[in-house]
């Protein structure tokens, strides 16, 4: 899933989310992002684009890790 995470991060970068990192857990992509990006990631229309990008990379789902350090 490392390749899938890299693919997802590349696509997220094209969406303007270059500081977002993708971590895989049981086929689900967990995003860690600066607080300033979290609201944008969670709201349409960007939310839909993020979900499409992550699923296109091979993940079954996507979540945002709000407790990342």
Residue spans of the language-model regions?
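ATP/NTP-dependent adenylation/nucleotidyl-transfer catalytic domains that generate, transfer
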Residues: 1-69
